[in-house]
Amino acid sequence: MRDEMRLVIVTMDTHLSSATAMAAARLARQYPGLHLDMHAASEYSADPAALARVKAAISSAHVVLVSMLFLEDHFLPVLDDLKRRRDDLDALICIMSAPDVVKLTRMGRFDMSKPASGPMALLKRLRGKRPGENQGAKGGRSETSGSGASQMKMLRRLPKILRFIPGTAQDIRLYFLSLQYWLGGSDANMESLAGMLVNRYAAGPRQVWQGRLPVAEPIEYPDLGVYHPKMAGRIADQADRLPGMRTTAKPRVGLLMLRSYLLAGNTAHYDGMIAALEAKGLTVVPAFAMGLDARPAIEAFFMRDGRVVVDAVVSLTGFSLVGGPAYNDAQAAEDILTTLNVPYLAAHPLEFQSLADWGGSNRGLMPVETTIMVAIPELDGATSPMVFGGRPGVRGQACQGCH
């Protein structure tokens, strides 16, 4: 009988929770003793019981993956726990997070607390500018435009380059593969991510797990596309495949959505919005882009041959038009909105509290939600901020005040 193997994921919110839960159920069924668990900062930052659960999970974990912990309210409650367990864990993988978190990464010979050397030093020299550097460049699209697509191309290329370099490069390769699996966050990719980390890093009495799990290459999904629940395959790269696109008489609304929610199958709030707009007699163009720069989606699906083909744009992302929690480029957003010259509204799902908490509170949005979801989009030029969805509260209880 194998020793138990515990993988814990700590991340910003719950948008990959359904995909992770499906992956965890399959792994547990096929490999008794293998546990995959996810904890969201949007829950434990405001709930002492949830914080106690994530601390206990980190304490008993063998491999921990941390992702998207940018905000101090999210990473400070667990930072000491991660530091305390760092050297005891089989591996600690920290991606897309605050520098204090990322530098805790330790995967085999790859230790991000040490000065960069060898392959990592070379990659840092090759990486170019980070998103947010030289913001607001004049003359059309800023330097950050299209960064999501270009970074994904590099991310897909790096593991192929590193495959043939021995030593620490193999651990660096798995770090970048972890990013690929995460950004393609379907249940299949989450299952392969867990399998890859177990196969490589299970240590001590858990070494019997090494090499036992089948691992597929990261499944690649479109970086840019459209979505509709009634469309075959749900995701496509051509707007002509959307229902109602052959009708030109109806007003047309462009919706901006997060790709990560779509890949994870966490789409009920989007589906509800699409249905509500269509019930009003509107043709809906729901679009997404890689990363948090919506301009490629706007240019591909809300414009044609330089001509604007939508009558209004509604962002459902909860973020700025160009940027996310770590940065935003209001000038670039202003430029593309000037080109569109149609009404631009920002609606947001509740990310850091449940609908029940929001509806039953005199406060309404939390300060971090007000900043990210209302104030920053207004700098872009968004109007009429509103809540359009979120996580339910206790099962079976209707939300009080959600109207």
Regions picked out by a protein language model, each given a short descriptive name:
Residues 1-403:
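An N-terminal assembly and electron-transfer interface module characteristic of large anaerobic redox
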